[in-house]
């Protein structure tokens, strides 16, 4: 396993470790929360398929596991001898912030037992000090919201990923007469283009055929639209990726979802494919109007 692909997320309870783990998961990492420290070496020695689709590993470890503090130094040494050099990320926050977060969630603090909440927070902070000292990265999340923390962790995850992380893009053609897709992020209406449905020799065909594509795409209106819209997508997609958006569904509609929307969606698909993406495409209503032909 690549040495840069192993992370241990640790730190104070309430500092955002679960949020950090979600960011690693979104970046294609295999993640385990509350991993028993004694099982880590055995887990990392398990064989992986050569074609496994994993960018790396991220394990959340903290005082919830009874043996964590006592065994962590020896396990870390053992990992190093076997070629596994984890990057330790220590998350923390101001005591007042942790107190506020726990008060809002009403969860029990793992260092609680018979102590008050503030005493538990102080106790954990003291217990975790040796781990903090050996951590490569210390992130204070006091002034972070969820999105800001995910963005910082995502930058770390992407930098060490074994392969580039890209957003999943799906194209969906549809007919407005059958309803707008509820899961669409972007919806564009092609009903301003001339409708092949009213051309006798094109009526029975669909937007995947050369005849319909030529009819739809060769108009000045379609060419102007595609120039502007494809430029907009080229601008938006990197920004969506930067914000951590994992999926983008682009819905292209016309009246029945058989001709214009299909031809335009196919053109957008080709453009995104040429840009290095691997978009999916579904023509939801392409066969819905066949009984009316």
Swiss-Prot record:
Signal peptide bounds: none
Binding site for GTP: 62-65
Cystine connections: none
Function: Displays ATPase and GTPase activities.
Family: Belongs to the RapZ-like family.
Protein residues bound to ATP: 11-18
Full protein name: Nucleotide-binding protein HRM2_27900
Pfam annotation, one family: PapZ_C
Top-level division of the source organism's lineage: Bacteria
Glycoprotein among keywords: no
Keywords (A to Z) from UniProt: ATP-binding, GTP-binding, Nucleotide-binding
Gene Ontology molecular-function annotations: ATP binding; GTP binding
Keyword DNA damage included in the entry's annotation: no
């Amino acid at each position: 396993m690549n040495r840069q692909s192993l992370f241990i997320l640790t730190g104070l309870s309430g500092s955002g470790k679960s949020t950090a783990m979600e960011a690693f998961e979104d970046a294609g990492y295999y993640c385990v929360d509350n991993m028993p420290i004694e099982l880590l070496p055995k887990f990392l020695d398990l064989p992986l398929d050569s074609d496994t689709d994993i960018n790396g590993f991220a394990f959340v470890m903290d005082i919830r596991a009874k043996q964590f503090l006592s065994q962590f130094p020896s396990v870390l040494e053992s990992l190093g001898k076997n070629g596994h050099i984890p990057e330790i990320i220590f998350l923390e926050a101001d005591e007042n912030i942790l107190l506020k977060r726990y008060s809002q969630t009403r969860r029990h603090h793992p260092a609680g037992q018979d102590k008050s909440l503030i005493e538990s927070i102080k106790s954990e902070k003291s217990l975790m000090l040796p781990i903090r000292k050996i951590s490569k990265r210390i992130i204070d999340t006091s002034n972070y919201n969820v999105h800001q923390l995910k963005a910082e962790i995502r930058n770390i995850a992407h930098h060490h990923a074994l392969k580039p992380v890209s957003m999943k893009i799906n194209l969906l053609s549809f007919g407005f007469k059958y309803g707008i897709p509820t899961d669409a992020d972007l919806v564009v209406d092609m009903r301003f283009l001339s409708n092949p449905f009213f051309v006798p020799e094109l009526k029975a065909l669909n937007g995947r055929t050369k005849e319909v594509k030529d009819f739809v795409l060769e108009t000045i209106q379609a060419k102007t639209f595609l120039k502007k819209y494809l430029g907009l997508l080229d601008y938006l997609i990197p920004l969506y990726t930067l914000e951590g958006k994992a999926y983008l569904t682009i819905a292209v509609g016309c009246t029945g979802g058989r001709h214009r929307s299909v031809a335009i969606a196919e053109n957008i698909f080709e453009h995104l494919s040429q840009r290095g993406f691997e978009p999916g495409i579904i023509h939801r209503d392409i066969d819905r109007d066949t009984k009316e032909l």
